[in-house]
Regions:
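Conserved nucleotide-binding/hydrolysis micro-motifs of P-loop NTPases
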Residues: 32-37, 56-61, 189, 209, ...
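Domain-level recognition of nuclease-like catalytic cores that cleave nucleotide substrates
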Residues: 314-335
Length: 335
């Protein structure tokens, strides 16, 4: 465990692997950092290892069904008895987060756990990777970024607000990506000459960490206010990332937004015999679905045509419902 702290071991592991190339799976090396970016690592074991990037537990893993296909994948039939998906059932786990210890030990105080986790992260993982300089300023940057999860990322504005250089903000953002705290989602562009937003969006990979950073401890408070949608969207994007990463695949995930503000929260790119296909997903905090929630998906279909696959509005209800042509209201629990 934490192999990045002992990079000298990798040379010996390489020698052992090369001496037993016909035997696979003898070594499992884990760590909380991107090994390729860790200090002192010169041996990458290229050609000898399979790399898996594991985020906190997914909803599938927490409900004991980790191999269930996504709804749009082959075999992705609806659940016979989906887990509770009401708002009351959804927000507690969203505030608590999905780290294994918090899932396995429900009596643990999530606030104290995240406080300790972030303290350890700042004192150990971050300083192991780079010289931060002003640690307090970095903490303020992380909190400010948490308040912007699921929003268009204006690093220049954020840097100006905090009184730091834009290059510092870029470096710190890259550090958060390297330590798997955040992911930057790029907008999807097609060669259509359309006026589309080119600014990326940032998402935290764990909603419990996000809620802790913005001072939310109560599920009712997390479910209220103008940022509730951003928090739920963060949870859905995290689930889509986990679905790919936890089976060894690279996420092919985007969002779509026009210059006038028409948006689709997530696009999952897949391929079939017809070529590229885009599965659109909208995220809504309501427990009641309506056809108007699919307006962004309809606009996307009008712009991209047959490239757009049947879409979904992920919501907090408990049943699948048709929302017009090629759009289904999908309970969060079925994602």
């Amino acid at each position: 465990d934490e192999v990045q702290h002992a990079p000298a071991l990798l040379t010996y592991v390489k020698e052992r692997i090369d001496g037993e190339r016909d035997r696979r799976g003898l070594w499992v090396l884990t760590g909380s950092q991107n090994l390729l970016l860790a200090k002192g690592v010169t041996e990458t074991l290229a050609g000898r290892v399979a790399l898996l990037r594991l985020l906190p537990l997914s909803l599938r893993e927490m409900t004991g069904d980790p191999d269930r296909p996504l709804p749009w994948e082959a075999g992705g039939a609806r659940l016979a008895a989906p887990p509770p998906a009401s708002p009351a059932a959804s927000w507690p786990w969203l505030v608590r987060g999905c780290y294994p210890q918090l899932v396995a030990e429900p009596d643990l105080d999530p606030h104290l756990w995240h406080q300790s986790y972030l303290g350890t992260y700042l004192e150990r993982d971050v300083r192991d990777l780079t010289q931060i300089g002003d640690l307090l300023q970095f903490q303020l940057f992380v909190r400010a970024l948490a308040a912007r999860s699921a929003q268009l990322l204006n690093l220049s504005g954020l840097a100006r607000e905090l009184g730091i250089a834009v290059n510092t903000a870029k470096r710190w953002l890259s550090l958060l990506e390297a330590t798997y705290q955040v992911v930057v989602l790029r907008p999807y562009h097609a060669s259509l000459g359309k006026r589309l937003v080119k600014t990326p969006k940032v998402y935290f990979t764990d909603t419990g960490t996000l809620c802790h950073l913005v001072g939310l401890r109560d599920p009712d408070h997390a479910a209220a206010g103008p940022m509730a949608g951003a928090r739920l969207e963060t949870a859905v994007v995290a689930e889509l990332l986990k679905a790919a990463l936890h089976r060894g695949e690279q996420p092919d995930l985007y969002f779509w937004r026009t210059a006038t503000g028409v948006e689709v929260d997530a696009l999952v790119r897949t391929y079939d015999e017809r070529g590229e296909r885009l599965v659109p997903l909208e995220v809504k905090t309501t427990a009641t679905a309506s056809a108007r929630m699919a307006a962004g998906i309809a606009r996307l279909g009008g712009d991209l045509g047959e490239r757009v696959a049947p879409g979904y509005v992920v919501y907090l209800g408990d049943r699948r419902l048709p929302l017009g042509q090629n759009v289904t209201a999908l309970p969060l629990a079925e994602l």
